[in-house]
Amino acid sequence: MEGYKSFLAFLVSSLLLGFLGVIFTLVWVLHWREGLGWDGGAAEFNWHPVLVTSGFIFIQGIAIIVYRLPWTWKCSKLLMKFIHAGLHLTALIFTIVALVAVFDFHNAKNIPNMYSLHSWIGLTVVILYALQLVLGVSIYLLPFASNTLRAALMPVHVYSGLFIFGTVIATALMGITEKLIFSLKEPPYSKLPPEAIFVNTFGLLILVFGGLVVWMVTTPAWKRPREQGMEILSPTVSSPDETEEGSTITDCSNTEKSDVELNSEAARKRILKLDEAGQRSTM
């Protein structure tokens, strides 16, 4: 892999930022909000940001970059497809529970559903994500689609996945801003109390996390090799000079082998000529 150290830096940074985003969400709802529960109250609503951040953002981000991990390139493509689909399915389950939590809370408090832009885009992107998962499994995991169809739809599959991922992060940023505006009264959000600063920082974390994931998955040099027998490059890969040297040694060995074969053939012909001459002299 070209730029292995750069890839490793991006990977570690993205995982750290994503994990910090999950921690920030938990600290937010446990310290400044009402905690977590499942009673139709505010504590049930708090599952919504926690599950969206951990599942729809963090786990989905891992699912997107899992093919780019060079340590998995020796694994079979089928196994990686199962891992890729399994992570996406886990993210979808987290998201569905998050939707149930927010609808339960709204219904228990007689709060209208689906009136804000956040809710419109949020539900739309969940539906698109579910369709993406179903179509991805049907075309790329199950053995029904032809290779031609798979190759033709791959650019659409990749683009729609990145579009959904980016839309999820944008919708999450809208949601946390909306929550702060509704919840912070004394002092208001405009006064930037500690909770506002903390949650704004959380928003920056998931935004940068998304940017790093998109960068890793769109860098051609970090793409998983296509051929089964392709050499897997790692930090300990031989340098081009070493590869050239190995090629030279192989060529030299082949040359020596050819010389030996030629000498053996010449000796055999000389022996045959001597035998023929001996037979003539005897006659």
UniProtKB/Swiss-Prot annotation:
Heme b 1 binds at H48, N113, M114, Y115, S116, H118, E178. SMART domains: B561 (SM00665). This is Plasma membrane ascorbate-dependent reductase CYBRD1. It is an enzyme of class 7 (translocase). The gene is cybrd1. It is found in: Cell membrane; Apical cell membrane. It catalyses: Fe(3+)(out) + L-ascorbate(in) = monodehydro-L-ascorbate radical(in) + Fe(2+)(out) + H(+); Cu(2+)(out) + L-ascorbate(in) = Cu(+)(out) + monodehydro-L-ascorbate radical(in) + H(+); monodehydro-L-ascorbate radical(out) + L-ascorbate(in) = monodehydro-L-ascorbate radical(in) + L-ascorbate(out). The keyword Transit peptide does not apply. The lineage of its organism: Eukaryota, Metazoa, Chordata, Craniata, Vertebrata. Its EC number is 7.2.1.3.
